[in-house]
């Protein structure tokens, strides 16, 4: 039990240190790349098209590298509960710098206690947005269908803007 508590505390401390480091680097914002509204909109539109082609109704949330909502799209008829989940998926992808599916795998295997960290989603549909240098620019979260379909829509959005992510 004590070992699980130590691991959980380690995860919480890691999340806090990551947040503090993000704040410390915020003053250098003008020097680092960022996610533009144009790119976020194009990403959401591509994810929207994929969902329409698949015959599913979803919410699409795109956040910047600080986890702040940058662009949001709700398809007509998408389930109400999926609104917040889409935003939490996008946030998780940024905060953990991994897809939400990968975060789920970590919570099962490597790091007991991560499931206790608030606002982290541990199933598919959230993907970090990275530029060609691997820098985190934001996250996309899709929710309203199965985790596999949500992830496919998020990936379609990301794939559509690869050339815009410098």
Predicted ranges, named:
Residues 27-166:
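Flexible, solvent-exposed loop/hinge segments and secondary-structure transition points
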Residues 10-23:
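Bacterial N-terminal signal peptides
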Residues 1-8:
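N-terminal secretory signal peptides that target proteins for export/translocation
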